[in-house]
Amino acid sequence: MFHKLTGFCAATATFALMTGAAAAEDWSRIQTEEAFKGLAVGPVWHFSSGTQEAFDDGTLTGHVPGYGNFRGTWEWRDEMYCRKIDFYEIDKKGDDCLIIEAQGNDIRITRDFGKGKSYTAQLQPKE
């Protein structure tokens, strides 16, 4: 029985790894400003740690519970979303350029020119 259970666990683990790999492949990198605007300008970005909204005029606003509201500017540069916000750590280091990836109504941002921490947000129409 142990042998059968071990085989089942191995098969389950293999399936989970394959499913995870397939899910990771579903993310598509956003490489143009036009694609970024079509996807992420207008909707509210809902992160587990707060919200953000990017506007067509190059401004952005957001809110992080415990820290408050923030605002700033953004531009598309070198296939990345670059933002400068007047809010704690970002302001201390200036621009933060992020790689943007999309999967359905979700986006994944990776900070520090794609070398930093990644966060996932759900895009929802503004109420």
Regions found by a protein language model. Name each.
Residues 7, 19-127:
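Lipid interaction determinants
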Residues 9-17:
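Bacterial N-terminal signal peptides
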Residues 1-10:
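Bacterial N-terminal signal peptides that target proteins for export
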